[in-house]
Amino acid sequence: MKKVTIRDFIKKKSTKEKITMLTAYDYPTAKIISNTGLDSILVGDSLGMVVLGYPNTLNVTMRDMISHTRAVARANPPQLIVADMPFLSYEIDTKSAVKNAGLLVKAGSDAIKLEGGEEMKDTVKAIVKAGIPVMGHIGLTPQRFLRLGGFRTIGKTKQEEDQLIKDSLELEDAGVFSLVIENTYVDIAKRITEKLNIPTICIGAGPYCDGQVLVINDLLGLSEFTPYFAKSYVNLKEIISNAINQYIIDVKNNKFPEKQHYKERES
């Protein structure tokens, strides 16, 4: 599989070929993904919740994102690597936003993703001007859950719906190459997808986007809580628990290690 680029994303929209994206946070997971036909890896700030055990993404730092981006990049996957910009790494001023985006690219990402709508237009323009591809993210933006009043579906009111559409158009105009739409109503996501020339990637926004993204822990059945819009394709938590319990039994009953697991001196 050849390296996926942002040009491939744009092409897939025109050919109506769905884009597939999953999160990954470490080398072994990225190595497994590298041998699949997945289009893109998102090194998401969701790692704060599913890897580091935080209640939300607000505690994730640039150091965290750089470290995990490097781990994923070391697997040398052909997938497009997109790294999330964590909370307060891009909101303060455009100069620090460009610098932090550059640090993620130096760590191995092919593009960065940031949350927010029209208020992020100047920031997006500055990062793109620096030569760094930007993926937008609207709808439920987890870094802004306090302002939104919690984790909820966005677009219930006409005002919210109009703002989502305006945000999407402003971000496209600012230069994002694609747009994540999270946890909004299916008809809104469909309207946005039809209006934009760039591909949309849905998570909890229905089947009419140009692609889908999931947190890999949800897909593998590893999450403590799986949101309604996610699908588990395997119960890896149960498989891992069973393996650990079997190991305990084998050790206690002297069934592990067996002869093939150690060396004896030759007499």
From Swiss-Prot:
SUPFAM superfamilies: Phosphoenolpyruvate/pyruvate domain. It catalyses: 3-methyl-2-oxobutanoate + (6R)-5,10-methylene-5,6,7,8-tetrahydrofolate + H2O = 2-dehydropantoate + (6S)-5,6,7,8-tetrahydrofolate. Pathway: Cofactor biosynthesis; coenzyme A biosynthesis. Its EC number is 2.1.2.11. NCBIfam families: panB, PRK00311.1. CDD domains: KPHMT-like. The active site is at E182. It is an enzyme of class 2 (transferase). Its main location: cytoplasm. Keywords: Coenzyme A biosynthesis, Cytoplasm, Magnesium, Metal-binding, Transferase. The gene is panB. One of its GO terms (molecular function) is 3-methyl-2-oxobutanoate hydroxymethyltransferase activity. GO terms for cellular component: cytoplasm. Binds 1 Mg(2+) ion per subunit. This is 3-methyl-2-oxobutanoate hydroxymethyltransferase. Mg(2+) binds at D45, D84, E115.
